[in-house]
């Protein structure tokens, strides 16, 4: 906000004074302060779906602490769709009977040193057919702030029919360019409206756009106040869905940075539809992508393998690196690289072949931007590999990955 003010001395002094007395102004520009690194936590949708209730969320918070996930960096406990009840005569939203006291639940989550997230839609109905925020944006933002909400996922859902623009992604259909532009502008305004509503509560709230990437959201979401935005349709708990989504992020790296992140959807690790190697691929790829790490499994029932994948601190450190640079593909055989602070680089070498013999894949160090030998550490084997001269050849398991940290 202060950056917008003229740089004259009096303006600078006024800004400094304003920030001392109203520190929330510092976060109010959706600056990097709200999510300086990609948000980490848990979301109810992938495992619990429409059945999620108060007890499930409390159990998730308990497990986040007991398992060590909180200490590994997972902080947000996010309720997805289906918590919404009816509005009262004044238009205030209430939770449904699955969530008897939302404020008490938020207090419980906070008492564990965690943060509390919630879900709504700019449309009249959410994707699950529950009450959305359409026409009640400020009122809902005020309610969330009163409950102690720290994170809002805002899901387009029924707002698509308000936009009357189903064909935004299908230009071949007979829709005029003007109509497309109008629909896009309406969507942007709807997202910005909630952004302004959240700001005026003066509570820092991470703002997550969920509209499946429509209209190249990564190009305009930061301007509309988004801290993260879904880039694709919903993920499923299988290798095909996860790898299609993950590897299709190539090219979006220039849109991410501290405070504004591409979101290829939540983690499926621990949900049972993939092998441990394939889940290691999701964890590694999401870390290379500087993607939000929102676990989507039942945290109260994790086996040792699931814990070891979700809580690999060396991989988490790649995701959470303070430079906030999203990695990119550096070689056709799915070799990806993410620059890290201090000049180090994370490199992930993926084997995407599931139904044939695994083949050796060679990383050329110069493709990762190194000239001369490098130190190498294997982040899944947790072991130093010594010095690499000019290349490194490995055979990652089918659907699996070898992930390295390289430095000179
Ligand atoms: C959409 C979103 C999902 C989930 C559901 C809930 O499909 O993309 O992540 O929030 O809605 O209804």
Predicted regions span which residues?
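C-terminal beta-strand-rich structural cap/linker in extracellular carbohydrate-active enzymes
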Residues: 387-408
């Amino acid at each position: 906000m202060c950056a917008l003010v003229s740089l004259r001395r009096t303006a600078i002094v006024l800004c400094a004074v304003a920030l001392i007395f109203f520190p929330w102004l510092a976060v109010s520009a959706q600056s990097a302060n709200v999510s300086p690194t990609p948000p980490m936590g848990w979301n109810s949708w992938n495992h619990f779906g429409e059945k999620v209730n108060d007890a499930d969320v409390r159990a998730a918070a308990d497990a986040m602490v007991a398992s060590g996930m909180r200490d590994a960096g997972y902080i947000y406990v996010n309720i997805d769709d289906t918590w919404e009840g009816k509005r009262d005569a004044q238009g205030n939203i209430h939770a449904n009977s699955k969530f008897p006291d939302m404020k008490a639940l938020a207090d419980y989550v906070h008492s564990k040193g965690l943060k509390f997230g919630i879900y709504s839609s700019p449309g009249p109905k959410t994707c699950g057919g529950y009450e959305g925020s359409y026409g009640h944006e400020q009122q809902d933002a005020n309610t969330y702030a009163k409950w102690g909400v720290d994170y809002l996922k805002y899901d387009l859902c029924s707002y698509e029919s308000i936009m009357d623009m189903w064909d935004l992604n299908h230009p071949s259909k007979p829709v005029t360019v003007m109509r497309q532009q109008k629909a896009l502008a309406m969507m942007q305004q709807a997202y910005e409206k909630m952004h302004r509503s959240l700001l005026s509560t003066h509570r820092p709230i991470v703002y997550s756009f969920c509209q499946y990437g429509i209209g190249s959201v990564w190009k305009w979401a930061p301007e509309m106040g988004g801290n993260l935005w879904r880039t694709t349709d919903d993920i499923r708990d299988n290798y095909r869905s996860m790898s299609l989504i993950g590897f299709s992020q190539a090219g979006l790296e220039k849109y991410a940075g501290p405070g504004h992140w591409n979101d290829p959807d939540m983690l499926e690790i621990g949900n049972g539809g993939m092998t441990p190697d394939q889940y290691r691929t999701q964890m590694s790829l999401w870390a290379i992508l500087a993607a939000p790490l929102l676990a989507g499994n039942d945290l109260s029932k994790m086996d040792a393998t699931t814990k070891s994948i979700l809580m690999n601190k060396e991989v988490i450190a790649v995701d959470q690196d303070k430079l906030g640079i999203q990695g990119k593909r550096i070689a056709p055989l799915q070799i990806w690289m993410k620059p890290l602070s201090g000049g180090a680089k994370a490199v992930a070498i993926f084997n995407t072949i599931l139904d044939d013999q695994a083949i050796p894949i060679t990383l050329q160090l110069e493709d990762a931007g190194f000239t001369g030998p490098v130190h190498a550490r294997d982040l899944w084997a947790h072991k130093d590999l010594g010095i690499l001269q000019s290349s490194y050849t490995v055979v990652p398991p089918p659907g699996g990955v070898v992930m390295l940290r390289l430095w000179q």
